[in-house]
Swiss-Prot record:
Organism: Mus musculus (Mouse)
Keywords: DNA-binding, Metal-binding, Nucleus, Repressor, Transcription, Transcription regulation, Zinc, Zinc-finger
PANTHER family: FORKHEAD BOX P, ISOFORM C (PTHR45796), FORKHEAD BOX PROTEIN P2 (PTHR45796:SF9)
Ranges annotated as biased composition (Basic and acidic residues): 325-336
Quaternary organization: Forms homodimers and heterodimers with FOXP1 and FOXP4. Dimerization is required for DNA-binding. Interacts with CTBP1. Interacts with FOXP1. Interacts with TBR1. Interacts with ZMYM2.
Protein name according to UniProt: Forkhead box protein P2
GO cellular component: nucleus
Any GO MF annotation of the entry: DNA-binding transcription factor activity
Region of interest (Disordered), ranges: 1-45, 280-338, 437-464, 648-667, 677-714
Effect listed in the UniProt record for changing L408A: Severely reduced transcriptional repression activity
Highest taxon of source: Eukaryota
Zinc fingers (C2H2-type) by residue: 345-370
Region named CTBP1-binding: 421-425
Entry text on domains: The leucine-zipper is required for dimerization and transcriptional repression.
């Protein structure tokens, strides 16, 4: 019995193994078939039914294992006896439709799979189920997307077809309308052949009348504005009215410039340099001259006010024909030679300059490009403003020419001598007297704006004997004239002379003495004197060869400078007694000397034509006042005085250069004694004479004079 039961169990186990292998193979095949069938269709196949049966069997086996663990059966026999009773119930409850109780009993009785194998098998089955679910969902989504895409494509195709149909319908309608219009036009032409020509002629006549009225009104306004401008200019010249500089002088400038940008206006202003005057006639438009229709400003104003409003008709294609008809109907026919806007084959319209081969082409260009519109009217306004500005400029230039002619034909006036000449006056007093008496005096405030007046007449071009003493008086240095120490002049203006390129108002002898006196031991070598000159005055930092020669000449000429030999070499010192002695010997303005100056032989040769003109035109008596001389005139006068130093040294004793650019000297309060001139000398009045003491020896006084600057600055 035991052997038979063993053989049965072995056979059952082998059968079970074969059954499981067949089941597993069926499962694999089913899974493959399921995947392939899922690709083809979504319907439930037999393989899927096998899968469901296998799942139900596994669930039943799991429940049996749990029951065995909980019940804890003692003998396998009892378990074998109880299994046939329990399995059919559970299997019948779980899958009563698929697996029969006999099949479940066979599967459970064989006991081939262990619990671990059953769990692994369950996990594999679950993973397979998840994959199948994901694949099914993915397939469903793809089918939905494909369905949506198909629907969208169908809708787009339908819309395109509808649009094409609509376009075709519209084209057909347009073609039908064009055909109908052509048929109507043909019928009208057949019925009324002359009606269109009459309508065109009427439109042309209306447009011609409107254009003529516009041109007439514009010309009336222009003539009225020109008359108002001339009236204002005449009143302004007479001094009855004054126009502020910030206010527009002409009412035309306030007109709006419609149709032009600021860039175009600037271009028009640049291209009007060759504009002719418009005083003889107004603007000619289309060959119709309307300037003779107005006789006065009152009639023009009344006609312009009484003119009715004009309706502007649209000019489409008959513009050139209208203007040509108007030109033919006018009494005056223009030619290429007489037209102002045409010359040398070029259109002279401002800003145009189009090339036209003949006059007919020019007329076509004029009618097409420069028709009566906003742009052309704005260009006319700009041209009116240009003409008015040029007229104002012409009037100013004419007044300037008249003043120049008046000045050239006027007899030159001579400077009047002062009523009571003084022997000693200061430079400030001299300036005031000359400003009050001399007609060559300059205005006090030349920078203030004034009305245009006739220029002041200039002085004589020939030096008179009465003006020669003034030259000598001007050349005298104020520091030497009043015996003011040089240190008091240089100290306040030290920085000025050090930085400004201005000639100091002192003689070389005075400067050399000052350099020596400022040294610690009152003696300097020649190189130290040169260093003091360049260190103290910016003027001596150039032209070293000329002024150094003058310094050496003055050192050897004047007796007050003593050369001393010592261990270091030769040094120069100052003999104060000799210096003060020579300083006190000054010329006092001898009448005999003054009378002999015009008759001297060397005087005429020393003054050339340029020197005479410079002395006459630059008003030499004003040189003592630095505020009345500009930089250019001061440089010229300085050169003039440098030329005068060599020939007029006998007039005075000290000084050689114009103090025009030097700062105001610090003049101390000095008691000046006034003495009338001797009666026998009244025939030669003198505005300035210097110092009280008179020295009959001219050569002794010339010893202290410096080297002439005409030789220094060559």
């Amino acid at each position: 019995m035991m052997q038979e039961s063993a053989t049965e169990t072995i056979s059952n186990s082998s059968m079970n193994q074969n059954g499981m292998s067949t089941l597993s193979s069926q499962l694999d095949a089913g899974s493959r078939d399921g995947r392939s069938s899922g690709d083809t269709s979504s319907e439930v196949s037999t393989v899927e039914l096998l899968h469901l049966q296998q799942q139900q069997a596994l669930q039943a086996a799991r429940q049996l294992l749990l029951q065995q663990q909980t019940s804890g059966l003692k003998s396998p026999k009892s378990s074998e006896k109880q299994r046939p009773l329990q399995v059919p119930v559970s299997v019948a409850m779980m899958t009563p439709q698929v697996i029969t109780p006999q099949q479940m009993q066979q599967i459970l009785q064989q006991q081939v799979l262990s619990p671990q194998q059953l769990q692994a098998l369950l996990q594999q089955q679950q993973a397979v189920m998840l994959q199948q679910q994901q694949l099914q969902e993915f397939y469903k989504k793809q089918q939905e997307q494909l369905h949506l895409q198909l629907l969208q494509q169908q809708q787009q195709q339908q819309q395109q077809q509808q649009q094409q149909q609509q376009q075709q319908q519209q084209q057909q309608q347009q073609q039908q309308q064009q055909q109908q219009q052509q048929q109507q036009q043909q019928q009208q032409q057949q019925q009324h052949p002359g009606k269109q020509a009459k309508e065109q002629q009427q439109q042309q006549q209306q447009q011609q009348l409107a254009a003529q009225q516009l041109v007439f009104q514009q010309q009336l306004l222009q003539m009225q504005q020109l008359q108002q401008q001339q009236h204002l200019l005449s009143l302004q010249r007479q001094g009855l009215i004054s126009i502020p500089p910030g206010q527009a002088a002409l009412p035309v400038q306030s007109l709006p410039q419609a149709g032009l940008s600021p860039a175009e206006i600037q271009q028009l202003w640049k291209e009007v340099t060759g504009v002719h005057s418009m005083e003889d006639n107004g603007i000619k438009h289309g060959g119709l001259d309307l300037t003779t229709n107005n006789s006065s400003s009152t009639t023009s104003s009344t006609t312009s006010k009484a003119s009715p409003p004009i309706t502007h008709h649209s000019i489409v294609n008959g513009q050139s024909s209208v203007l040509n008809a108007r030109r033919d109907s006018s009494s005056h026919e223009e030619t290429g030679a007489s037209h102002t806007l045409y010359g040398h084959g070029v259109c002279k319209w401002p800003g145009c300059e189009s090339i036209c081969e003949d006059f007919g082409q020019f007329l076509k260009h004029l009618n097409n490009e420069h028709a009566l519109d906003d742009r052309s009217t704005a260009q006319c306004r700009v041209q009116m403003q240009v003409v008015q500005q040029l007229e104002i400029q012409l009037s100013k230039e004419r007044e300037r020419l008249q003043a120049m002619m008046t000045h050239l034909h006027m007899r030159p006036s001579e400077p009047k001598p002062s009523p009571k000449p003084l022997n000693l006056v200061s430079s400030v007093t001299m300036s005031k007297n000359m400003l009050e008496t001399s007609p060559q005096s300059l205005p006090q405030t030349p920078t203030t704006p004034t009305a245009p007046v006739t220029p002041i007449t200039q002085g004589p071009s020939v030096i008179t004997p009465a003006s020669v003493p003034n030259v000598g008086a001007i050349r005298r240095r104020h520091s030497d004239k009043y015996n003011i120490p040089m240190s008091s002049e240089i100290a306040p203006n030290y920085e000025f002379y050090k930085n400004a390129d201005v000639r100091p108002p002192f003689t070389y002898a005075t400067l050399i003495r000052q350099a020596i006196m400022e040294s610690s031991d009152r003696q300097l070598t020649l190189n130290e004197i040169y260093s003091w000159f360049t260190r103290t005055f910016a003027y001596f930092r150039r032209n070293a060869a000329t002024w150094k020669n003058a310094v050496r000449h003055n050192l050897s000429l004047h007796k007050c400078f003593v050369r001393v030999e010592n261990v270091k070499g030769a040094v120069w010192t100052v003999d104060e007694v000799e210096y003060q002695k020579r300083r006190s010997q000054k010329i006092t303005g001898s009448p005999t000397l003054v009378k002999n100056i015009p008759t001297s032989l060397g005087y005429g040769a020393a003054l050339n034509a340029s020197l005479q003109a410079a002395l006459a035109e630059s008003s030499l008596p004003l040189l003592s006042n630095p505020g009345l001389i500009n930089n250019a005139s001061s440089g010229l006068l300085q050169a003039v005085h440098e030329d005068l130093n060599g020939s007029l040294d006998h007039i005075d004793s000290n000084g050689n250069s114009s103090p025009g650019c030097s700062p105001q000297p610090h003049i101390h309060s000095i008691h000046v004694k006034e003495e009338p001139v001797i009666a026998e000398d009244e025939d030669c009045p003198m505005s300035l004479v210097t110092t009280a003491n008179h020295s009959p020896e001219l050569e002794d006084d010339r010893e202290i004079e410096e080297e002439p600057l005409s030789e220094d600055l060559e």
